[in-house]
Amino acid sequence: MELATTGKVNEVLFMNRGEGESSYAQNSSFTQQVASMATPALENAVETLFSKDFHLQALNAVDLGCAAGPNTFAVISTIKRMMEKKCRELNCQTLELQVYLNDLFGNDFNTLFKGLSSEVIGNKCEEVPCYVMGVPGSFHGRLFPRNSLHLVHSSYSVHWLTQAPKGLTNREGLALNKGKIYISKTSPPIVREAYLTQFHEDFTMFLNARSQEVVPNGCMVLILRSRQSSDPSDMQSCFTWELLAKAIAELVSQGLIDEDKLDAFNIPCYFPSLEEVKDIVERDGSFTIDHMEGFGLDSLQMEENDKWVRGEKFTKVVRAFTEPIISNQFGHEIMDKLYDKFTHIVVSDFEAKLPKTTSIILVLSKIDG
């Protein structure tokens, strides 16, 4: 089934649930490293809020696209720690922290809240009591009342789209991106244009919703998967989808997957360049860019020399965030075969020595007035 509508994507876009071997909770170490790179930016954002004369009694913060791993707990701890530091410096007496944890309805909120502990949120007798609430729903629309948020955080979520790009079939209904699930070297220009158009539309909706919810001078800290090259089909930015498409194609050749299902499937995700993100923010005009930087990390952070161990580790990471949406299209019964094939391709094509993964840290302030 094509992911042609927002409603359909919202139903199947979530990380692997639970705490098992293939779960996101057990395979989120890479995104944890990505988020840790943005910790100084998050700390600075909290400091900045205290310098803007909000006369805060409670700081309202949200983690958009929080998933169910430990990463969101680190975000809460960082915000709380910085607030306690500022309270001691400013001799605040009554400051409280309200944190909202947001993701789509399919997110494993049970595992998420099961992982909350007193080590994360502390107790209500501390100098900064912390209250946590779940908020299911799409962050591409409004989630909160006007002027109610002081701080917005989102890591590795905003590059996901509300739907597969429109216009990827011709007048006869034939697929224009045959054999691929994302932009590739063989994709016609219209595929690249459709993906950028969809990202522009979705990121603009995201900014518009936040512009209504964030207080004037409030802050947003966003971390997105991105690319360095101006070419969206550059292997550094699309290697995961290229390898996954290759694994699916091999199962098609074995008669295990219908070729039409592969041709009809386009992953609802886009890895933008710094220039594309900057252009959209400036066109929207609701926020100023306080800080923006790109950085690269090894796709596998491990000392293991065995290429098969590295390949299997990478497969677990990819499976944790792709299996729900991939299995919806191609069937749950072939997932083990598919990801086993993926491992073999990773090892044979790269010997598990993968390109660096590029990300963007973006710090925005809501324009006053």
UniProtKB/Swiss-Prot annotation:
Catalysed reactions, semicolon-separated: theobromine + S-adenosyl-L-methionine = caffeine + S-adenosyl-L-homocysteine + H(+); 7-methylxanthine + S-adenosyl-L-methionine = theobromine + S-adenosyl-L-homocysteine + H(+)
Binding, caffeine: T31, Y156, H159, W160, R225, F321
A GO molecular-function descriptor: metal ion binding
SUPFAM superfamilies assigned to the protein according to its UniProt record, in alphabetical order: S-adenosyl-L-methionine-dependent methyltransferases
Any GO BP annotation: methylation
Cofactors, names only: Mg(2+)
UniProt keyword annotations, A-Z: Magnesium, Metal-binding, Methyltransferase, Transferase
Effect noted on mutating C269S: Strongly reduced caffeine synthase and theobromine synthase activities
InterPro entries in alphabetical order: MeTrfase_7, MeTrfase_capping, SAM-dependent_MTases_sf
Claim: Metal-binding is one of the keywords in the record: yes
Domain of life: Eukaryota
Residues reported to bind Mg(2+): N177, D263, F265, N266
EC number, UniProt record: 2.1.1.160
Pfam name, any one: Methyltransf_7
Cofactor note: Binds 1 Mg(2+) ion per subunit.
Listed pathway(s): Alkaloid biosynthesis
Marked site positions, Involved in substrate discrimination: H153, R225, C269, V317, H332
Record-listed S-adenosyl-L-homocysteine binding positions: Y24, C66, N71, D103, L104, S138, F139
Function: Involved in the biosynthesis of caffeine. Catalyzes the conversion of 7-methylxanthine (7mX) to theobromine and of theobromine to caffeine.
Family per record: Belongs to the methyltransferase superfamily. Type-7 methyltransferase family.
UniProt protein name: Caffeine synthase 1
Source species: Camellia taliensis (Wild tea)
Gene: TCS1D
